[in-house]
Amino acid sequence: MVRTLYLNESDRDIRVVMDGPSILIKDPERADRRIPIRFISRVVIFGNIWISSDVLTALAGQNIPLICISKWASNISISMPFQFTYPAHCIDLELVLKDQQKAMDFTNWARQKRAFMKTEVIRRIYPNADISCSNYREIISFLMPEDREKWLTVKNTLKALFWSLITEHLISLGLDPHCGIINRKSAFGLVRDYAYIMSPEMDYQALQFFRSDSIDTLIRSDRKPCLLTAKGIHNIINRFENRQYIVRRLVGEIKDKLYELMGTDYEGKLSRLL
């Protein structure tokens, strides 16, 4: 079973190198870890990690995306494989972009889906209350920590995890992550489209993080910007992994809508265009 490889910055001199068909994680204070690359679906790096270029090219060769998150979760970088072929799905998606009616259909569907997810989040937080999703932003603002820097740090970290899963999903489908419908002409436009729809789930996981016991051991606010501790990163990853069945279901629903708009005759459309 393929899994996500998470690597977190440490005071120890951790090095990541290739060893045959496996990635070798060398830790001076622990036994070396060897992970066959065929068991890795994506790699997420928090902070600074020494990693050899052989690892980067091996990941690209296996269509495995690499996501890097800065120490303070202020920047996200995504390294993708370089595709020499132009999948038929990409052409179908471009046809959707050129069809204003189909593009509008997807945009309206995305807004409705996002509104439904907002309602679901409100119901989880206040199960006995009859609150409209029109009050969603006020509710989230009320429940946020007073220190907004803490919120941004956690939310950006979650956004990176969601982006990593979405990017992996799109690559596996042969869809261009940059070919956005809502976020046109934007880097990773289609990833942003997915993330726009799924943002209420990010809010919910962020709120749950701040309900954790001993929150002061999870995030440091004695310096700006705020910094997640190793324990805090572990908390966020566990929460994300435990709710992946929901996240993957949402990803699948968005994919189904895209396929509905693109149609199913990929080979026919491709041959006509070529």
Tell what function each PLM region has.
Residues 2-15, 75-274:
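Active-site helix-to-loop segments that bind/position phosphate- or nucleotide-bearing substrates
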Residues 1-35:
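N- or domain-start disorder-to-order transition segments that initiate the globular core
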Residues 15, 24-26, 33, 43, ...:
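Residues in flexible loops and secondary-structure boundaries
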Residues 35-38, 42-83:
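Glycine/small-residue-rich interface belts in oligomeric ring/scaffold proteins
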Residues 33-36, 144-146:
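A short alpha-helix capping/helix-coil boundary motif
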Residues 23, 39-40, 142:
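General secondary-structure edge motif
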